[in-house]
């Protein structure tokens, strides 16, 4: 590409200004001599080279985003896929490219979670902090500091007034989400606390740890009121069902256990995974009809509860908890499955994996409908907003990404 005489002169002046402002005096002298330039450079050239440089990078990013969107649209057009107007919100799925890629953490992201009410989300990291972001604008809001080691999991109560976090520092912290103050710290586990989840009534909290136990905590006092024992290895994740009567846990012992909260009885031990089970998710009621359909006419009357589990054996399994039977196994990821969520519309499952992708599964037909190249490194966590069309992911690449669904 050939520059005009005027463009060449402007470029020379911008380069001269850059050399002068960065103190490269001898280079500037030589450059001005070679380029036969006057000694004085007008003010309008101050910082011009940097401005041009950053605007080129910005434009390049926009071009790449538009190219990705165009490629996506062409693919959909060729496959005769419906557009957003024709597709109902219950069928919207995350589409590339990511709407935002948010940086700020200094270590891998361990967990991402939407706030149940406000348009914010939180991310937990091995850098011992929790960060709060606005997922609609991509703005960073604040950092919560208090843990002294990796933050492993976070959970909101149903109103979103309280946030609980747990850490490798062996503590659980309770944060007031209005003032962002740490209002309680709970001690009792003997090792890394890997998971935390509020009970639906908001009065109690459940935690799981590398010490092989699950504990129930009373928020008013901060005391441990129940301990569930039975897992033979590190308990990775614990999640409570919608009415708070059951809790599910998964472990390095390759099992998923379901417990009756009232009497601590282990109702089911699910043992078909062949490696560490990393993540679990209870089916919301919106999914029960779809799952019953998949199970066939003779079992249609059954209303669950149903549970998903994701494992280092690279599979996702769906379980009928009333019978302890594995309904299906979804195969497709090329590495550990680290996160799994139900689509609020009930038809899909979305998963995140160490193969750096997120996958959308049409479980009725037992097939992977879409694969998104999500991150530069392992994808460690995923969440789907209950009512807004957004998915968020976190990664070892230290970024949080926001994906729009359509």
Curated annotation (Swiss-Prot):
Residues 54-81 form a coiled coil. One of its GO terms (biological process) is germ cell development. Gene3D superfamilies: 1.20.960.30, YVTN repeat-like/Quinoprotein amine dehydrogenase (2.130.10.10). Its main location: cytoplasm. The keyword Secreted does not apply. WD repeats lie at residues 104-145, 146-185, 188-227, 230-269, 272-329, 332-371, 374-406. Keywords: Cell cycle, Cell division, Coiled coil, Cytoplasm, Cytoskeleton, Microtubule, Mitosis, Repeat, Transport, WD repeat. GO terms for molecular function: dynein complex binding; microtubule plus-end binding. The keyword Calcium does not apply. Residues 7-39 form the LisH domain. Residues 74-99 are annotated as: Disordered. One of its GO terms (cellular component) is neuronal cell body. Residues 74-89 have a biased composition (Basic and acidic residues). It comes from the Eukaryota. It is found in: Cytoplasm, Cytoskeleton; Cytoplasm, Cytoskeleton, Microtubule organizing center, Centrosome. Dimerization mediated by the LisH domain may be required to activate dynein. Positively regulates the activity of the minus-end directed microtubule motor protein dynein. May enhance dynein-mediated microtubule sliding by targeting dynein to the microtubule plus end. Required for several dynein- and microtubule-dependent processes. Belongs to the WD repeat LIS1/nudF family. This is Lissencephaly-1 homolog. It comes from Branchiostoma floridae.
């Amino acid at each position: 590409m050939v520059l005009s005489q005027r463009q060449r002169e402007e470029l020379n002046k911008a380069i001269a200004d850059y050399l002068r402002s960065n103190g490269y005096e001898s280079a500037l002298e030589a450059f001005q001599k070679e380029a036969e330039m006057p000694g004085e450079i007008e003010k309008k050239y101050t910082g011009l080279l940097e401005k041009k440089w950053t605007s080129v990078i910005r434009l390049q990013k926009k071009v790449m985003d538009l190219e990705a969107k165009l490629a996506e649209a062409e693919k959909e057009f060729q496959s005769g896929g419906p557009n957003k107007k024709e597709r109902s919100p219950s069928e919207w799925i995350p589409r590339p490219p990511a709407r935002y890629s948010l940086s700020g953490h200094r270590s891998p992201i361990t967990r991402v979670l939407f706030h149940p009410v406000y348009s914010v989300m939180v991310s937990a990291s091995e850098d011992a902090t929790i960060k709060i972001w606005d997922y609609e604008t991509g703005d960073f809001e604040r950092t919560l500091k208090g843990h002294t080691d990796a933050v492993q999991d976070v959970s909101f109560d149903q109103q979103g007034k309280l946030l609980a976090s747990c850490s490798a520092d062996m503590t659980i912290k309770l944060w007031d989400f209005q003032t962002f103050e740490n209002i309680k710290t709970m001690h009792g586990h003997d090792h890394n606390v890997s998971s935390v989840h509020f009970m639906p009534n908001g009065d109690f909290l459940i935690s799981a740890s590398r010490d092989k136990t699950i504990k129930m905590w009373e928020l008013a006092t901060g005391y441990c009121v129940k301990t569930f024992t039975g897992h033979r290895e590190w308990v990775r994740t614990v999640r409570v069902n919608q009415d708070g009567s059951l809790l599910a846990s998964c472990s390095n012992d390759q099992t998923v256990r379901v417990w009756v909260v009232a009497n601590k009885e282990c109702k089911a031990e699910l043992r078909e995974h062949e490696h560490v089970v990393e993540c679990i998710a209870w089916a919301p009621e919106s999914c029960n009809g779809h799952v019953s359909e998949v199970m066939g006419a003779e079992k249609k009357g059954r209303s669950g509860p149903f549970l998903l589990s994701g494992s280092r054996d690279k599979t996702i399994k769906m379980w009928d908890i009333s019978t302890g039977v594995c309904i299906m196994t979804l195969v497709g990821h090329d590495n550990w499955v680290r996160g799994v969520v139900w689509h609020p519309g009930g038809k899909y499952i979305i998963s995140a994996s160490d193969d750096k992708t997120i996958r959308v599964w049409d479980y009725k037909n037992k097939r992977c409908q879409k694969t998104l190249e999500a991150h530069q490194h392992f994808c460690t966590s995923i969440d789907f907003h209950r009512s807004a069309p957004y998915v968020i992911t976190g990664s070892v690449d230290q970024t949080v990404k926001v994906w729009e669904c359509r």
